[in-house]
């Protein structure tokens, strides 16, 4: 490496400007680049003086404002965040002991639940109408669900083969051989377990059915007097005193996709002319050093391209406390009191300006609303699996979302993103204390969104779903295994949340939300246990002689019975509950026009294919979710990796590794049932053959080529593909642009490349004052890093270096000034290729 000359060649200067720079040594070069002419005490600190010049040479369009400042030691720093104005945000400890709460009530310490006590009489009167309606509706839902379950369970009891329940007397069995007693009791024990599990699972299915049915009626009629979207006409002026922060917490995400969606969203906001009411905060918890540098570069490009200086901010936390919820809490403590509202965006979120301004207007029209959740539509993926899921959520999702709103009204869900939140009550009431105790269900809350909604409602604020507000989008995982990775952490989080079921002051609706969150995953092991007991009952029936006489001196035998007409009727009614919501969804599309879904025939064929696909995947999800639930109870660690946000196919090796046990179970199950009773295999066929085919379905459905073929055939077509909204078109266009100029190996470029080193140095957040002890630590970090090979420098050590401007400057200086001493670093860097487009567009 010809140090000075090669260094100068990397600077974005004209030939004349390059020729004017000294080439004698690196210290002189950095002093020449230092416009202020400061003399640094240490030779290897000289790059600190040239940071400002190197930044302005490369990123002049991004630095038009007052972003460049000096820290207390005179080092150049990019002011990536506004000045903090701190607020206190402390969580209340959880009180989950119902006995203690009952004792407080006896002593008169708790007169009203907290969600009522926080309201004035006028506010109570204003909300009493919809609250009463919601309560009546939920009692009706409970009555419908329970009555339907009772009837179905009675039918189930009558079709079970062993009907001698009333004749079993444990006292009569005490004097007989234990094996005889076991043979008498075993079928009835199995049947009792089957009946209990059937009742629970049928009740769960019934609740979903009535939710979808009411959503269908709501959407078919088209009028909802309690819809929060009806509270504005959509063109009211926004109060300039009520500003909104768009916050996007990210962690090791696809940088190109994140900033493409964010740019499209911001440009859509600008198109409304209301951008003065909004600021954007990118809140990074990334701990991959290469991604951290890529985020900094992408932020600088975004500011330059949308003229976002002073309105688009970036921050990377060095201490990742409480993950996403802690990141949001940290924002609220430092900058929350500067805003009336905040909209939480996920890394894959895209929202139109009309949707965002509409959410703000809804907040202003409903001063008692604490959270308003939009209904994001899934789009943007090309694998067969993702397109099938997009179609399902786009077709069936509106029914269930409208149905949830019908039953819950202002005591509804919050899904953690694409929602607007009133900041002041969120700060005052929604801080999350860790769950007490030890074990896998203690500590920081993992799934924070449902809990924050419950706390907001407990404090007296409404939580609404604006199910009919368009312009909110998200992406789904591209394949089954990536979806299951996400499900694993959601499963653990929902199981943790159930510990809050008895917490003081929670609204009954949100207690039910915690219960349904648990059942979303607990239903899988219950279903598996139901199938296992049914199989065991069939084994007992096939291999043992029935016990016809269950009591001494019994005159008539108890014959095992089979009533196929009732079994078929019960099976048919269960299938109606499961599949009628899908049919109602398509009927709704037929009524309102199926053109955007490919036309009448294609949307119908897509429905049938999606039903087949869901039948194939349901047993696979059942087994995975069963493992997730068991692992959570056993305390196995849950790894919070960011889900794959891009189209990605599953390799055959991974598919057989993940699904191999399911394939084996399906084969053993099928062969065993075929040997025992071929007729029973007919009933189990959808289960066992789905398990046998699971690795093949997983791989084939993960391929974008198959998905794009169905797209050409207009199968699984959704309106966002038929007529893409501008914000999604822009997202795709900016994603292609970002891909063409993406930065790989960001940390190494931050050490070597003049421009990226200047950016990393100016963005470093460890701005300490002069300290002899700190200097010793810095030298130790730099020496240890450079004396090892780059491959041996682990992630945590790289992050320590990247967070300190002095260590980044010293490493930069040393590898250029003494390449022979640090040849392992120089040789490694020379093997890396910097994307030529990564800097050419700036």
UniProtKB/Swiss-Prot annotation:
SUPFAM superfamilies: Nucleotide-diphospho-sugar transferases. The chain crosses the membrane at residues 140-160, 194-214, 513-533, 570-590, 615-635, 656-676, 680-700. It is found in: Cell inner membrane. CDD domains: Glucan_BSP_MdoH. The keyword Phosphoprotein does not apply. It comes from the Bacteria. Involved in the biosynthesis of osmoregulated periplasmic glucans (OPGs). This is Glucans biosynthesis glucosyltransferase H. It comes from Cronobacter sakazakii (strain ATCC BAA-894). The lineage of its organism: Bacteria, Pseudomonadati, Pseudomonadota, Gammaproteobacteria, Enterobacterales.
């Amino acid at each position: 490496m010809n140090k000075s000359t090669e260094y100068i060649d990397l600077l974005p200067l004209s030939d004349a400007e390059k020729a004017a720079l000294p080439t004698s040594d690196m210290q002189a070069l950095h002093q020449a680049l230092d416009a202020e002419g400061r003399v640094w005490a240490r030779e290897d600190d000289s790059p600190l003086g040239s940071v400002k010049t190197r930044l302005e040479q490369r990123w002049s369009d991004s630095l038009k404002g007052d972003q460049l400042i000096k820290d207390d030691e005179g080092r150049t720093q990019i002011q990536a965040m506004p000045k903090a104005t701190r607020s206190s945000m402390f969580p209340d400890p959880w009180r989950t002991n119902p006995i203690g709460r009952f004792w407080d009530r006896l002593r008169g310490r708790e007169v009203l639940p907290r969600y009522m006590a926080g309201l004035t009489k006028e506010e109570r009167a204003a909300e009493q109408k919809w609250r009463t309606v919601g309560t009546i509706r939920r009692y009706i839902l409970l009555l419908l669900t329970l009555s339907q379950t009772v009837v179905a369970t009675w039918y189930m009891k009558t079709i079970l083969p062993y009907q001698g329940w009333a004749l079993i007397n444990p006292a009569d069995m005490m004097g007989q051989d234990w094996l005889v007693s076991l043979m008498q009791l075993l079928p009835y024990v199995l049947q009792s377990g089957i009946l209990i599990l059937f009742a629970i699972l049928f009740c769960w299915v019934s609740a979903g059915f009535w939710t979808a049915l009411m959503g269908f009626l709501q959407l078919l009629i088209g009028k909802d007097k309690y819809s929060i979207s009806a509270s504005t006409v959509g063109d009211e002026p926004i109060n300039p005193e009520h500003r909104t922060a768009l916050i996007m917490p990210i962690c090791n995400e696809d940088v190109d996709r994140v900033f493409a969606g964010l740019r499209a969203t911001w440009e859509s906001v600008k198109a409304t002319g209301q951008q003065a009411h909004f600021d954007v905060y990118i809140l990074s918890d990334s701990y991959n050093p290469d991604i951290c540098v890529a985020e900094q570069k992408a932020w600088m490009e975004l500011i330059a391209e949308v003229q976002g200086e002073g309105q688009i901010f970036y921050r990377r936390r060095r201490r990742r406390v409480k993950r996403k919820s802690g990141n949001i809490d940290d924002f609220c403590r430092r900058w929350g009191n500067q805003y009336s509202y905040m909209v939480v965006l996920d890394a894959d979120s895209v929202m139109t300006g009309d949707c965002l301004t509409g959410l703000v207007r809804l907040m202003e029209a409903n001063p008692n609303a604490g959270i308003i959740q939009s209904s994001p539509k899934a789009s943007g993926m090309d694998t067969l699996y993702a397109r099938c899921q997009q179609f399902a959520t786009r077709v069936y999702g509106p029914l269930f979302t409208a149905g949830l709103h019908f039953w819950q009204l202002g005591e509804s869900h919050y899904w953690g993103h694409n929602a607007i939140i009133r900041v002041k009550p969120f700060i005052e009431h929604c801080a999350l204390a860790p769950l007490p105790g030890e074990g896998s269900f203690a500590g920081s809350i993992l799934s924070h969104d449902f809990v924050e909604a419950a706390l907001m409602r407990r404090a007296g604020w409404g939580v609404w779903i604006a199910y009919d507000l368009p312009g909110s989008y998200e992406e789904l995982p591209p394949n089954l295994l990536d979806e299951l990775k996400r499900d694993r952490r959601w499963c653990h989080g929902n199981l943790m949340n159930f510990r809050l079921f008895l917490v003081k002051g929670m609204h009954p609706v949100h207690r039910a939300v915690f219960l349904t969150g648990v059942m979303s995953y607990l239903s899988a092991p219950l279903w598996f246990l139901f199938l296992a007991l049914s199989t065991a009952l069939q084994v007992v029936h096939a291999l043992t002689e029935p016990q016809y006489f269950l009591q001494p001196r019994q005159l008539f035998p108890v014959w095992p019975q089979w009533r196929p007409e009732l079994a078929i009727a019960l099976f048919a009614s269960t299938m109606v509950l499961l599949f009628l919501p899908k049919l109602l969804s398509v009927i709704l599309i037929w009524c309102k026009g199926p053109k955007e879904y490919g036309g009448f025939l294609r949307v119908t064929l897509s429905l049938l294919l999606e039903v087949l696909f869901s039948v194939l995947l349901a047993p696979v999800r059942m087994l995975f979710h069963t493992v997730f639930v068991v692992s959570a109870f056993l305390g196995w660690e849950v790894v919070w990796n960011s889900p794959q946000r891009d189209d990605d196919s599953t390799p055959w090796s991974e598919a057989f590794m993940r699904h191999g046990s399911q394939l084996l179970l399906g084969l053993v199950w099928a062969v065993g049932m075929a040997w025992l009773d071929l007729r029973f295999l007919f009933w189990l066929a959808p289960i066992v053959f789905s398990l046998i085919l699971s690795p093949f379905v997983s791989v084939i459905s993960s391929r974008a080529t198959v998905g794009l073929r169905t797209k050409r055939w207009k199968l699984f077509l959704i309106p966002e593909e038929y007529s893409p909204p501008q914000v999604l078109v822009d997202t795709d266009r900016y994603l292609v642009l970002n891909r063409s100029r993406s930065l790989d190996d960001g940390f190494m470029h931050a050490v070597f490349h003049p421009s990226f080193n200047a950016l990393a140095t100016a963005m470093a957040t460890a701005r300490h004052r002069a300290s002899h002890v700190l200097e010793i630590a810095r030298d130790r970090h730099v020496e240890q890093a450079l004396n090892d090979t780059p491959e041996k420098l682990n992630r945590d050590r790289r992050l320590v270096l990247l967070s300190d401007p002095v260590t980044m400057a010293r490493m930069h200086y040393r590898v250029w000034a003494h390449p022979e001493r640090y040849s392992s670093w120089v040789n490694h860097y020379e093997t890396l290729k910097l994307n030529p487009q990564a800097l050419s567009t700036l």
